[in-house]
Amino acid sequence: MANLLWGKVYYKDIFAGYLREEPGGRVTFTYDSSYIEGGHPAIAQTLPVREQPHISNNGLHPFFDNLVSEGWLEQAQSRLLGRREVTRFELLLAFGFDCAGAISIVDPEPSDLSEAMLDLDDPKEMAVLTSRASLSGVQPKLAVVEEGGIYRPARINELSTHIAKFPSANHPDLTLNEYLTT
């Protein structure tokens, strides 16, 4: 029988609860009693604080699924895990330490990363290797840290301070669209 996946969920560096894979493809999120007793807020509007687990019968709850990388970053992260097929839950556990927003997902038994699967001459892919960030969306982006006016990729187990966005050959108008809508 395969081991079921699980991870610890943090909200603003406070341990909030457990995300668990259950038999049959279900995934549950359960708030930890210390988080509930501490009077902390819900980690999401769709996941109110309560003692009973939040159950998603078909994989990750949409809140957690929306934290998983997409596009080129998802592909690079899958290659880095060294397997042809990787589930969304596996990606979230492996790279959810630094998600956009206040949530971190920590894998108690982190996966070994296979850098042999990446193009180490590509700065974007090299940055994937040095970070465990998960950023959703089709536009190429990386979690970065600003130090004295200089930006560099976030390192493993280091929270980012900014998100760097890059042009996309597949979506050439994204940068202009973002500029015009801000």
Model-flagged regions — what are they?
Residues 1-182:
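Phosphate/dinucleotide-binding and metal-coordinating scaffold of catalytic cores
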